[in-house]
Every structure is written in C-alpha cells, then in structure tokens.
C-alpha cells in the first residue's frame, strides 16, 4: 500500500494552532490523517464526503473529527500528496 506524503496549507497551519488553543484533542486529528495518508477507509462516524457545491474547495473532501470539528483535505494523486487544506468548525469553514 502506498503512503501519501502529507502537506499542509498555510491556512491549515494557522487553523491548527487555533484548534490547539481551543483545547481540541489533536490525537483524534492525527489518527484520521494517518488513515487518510494510507488512502484508508474512514469509519462512517467521520461522515467523510466530497465537497461538491463549494467552489472555494474544488476537488476537496471533508470529514468530521468531532461533531462540529471538520478537516478539509484533498488528494493530489499524480504526486502522491495528501494536502490538508483547513480545519475548524462547520460554521467557520462551510456555512458562508
């Protein structure tokens, strides 16, 4: 099985710092990222799906780390890269 190299957008890095300050359990995020980096299947509790109606996140997916904490990511298959695009609450990222 091929592992994807993990890359972080600048927006993601800033958002991650915010999640840490808010006391989020970053281990939950790391576990999900590990599964995604191996192109593994997430459990249905993560509600993983492609974002289709949001032009800001073209070709991206989102999954729920917690009920109101999501991770937006995309695969760059030609380069074997998992790009972490953003993280935060649904209302911060998608309810606009």
Predicted segment positions?
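Enriched for short, Lys/Arg-rich terminal
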Residues: 1-5, 14, 26, 63-70, ...
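N-terminal first-folded block
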Residues: 8-43
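A short, surface-exposed loop/turn module that caps and links secondary-structure elements
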Residues: 37-64
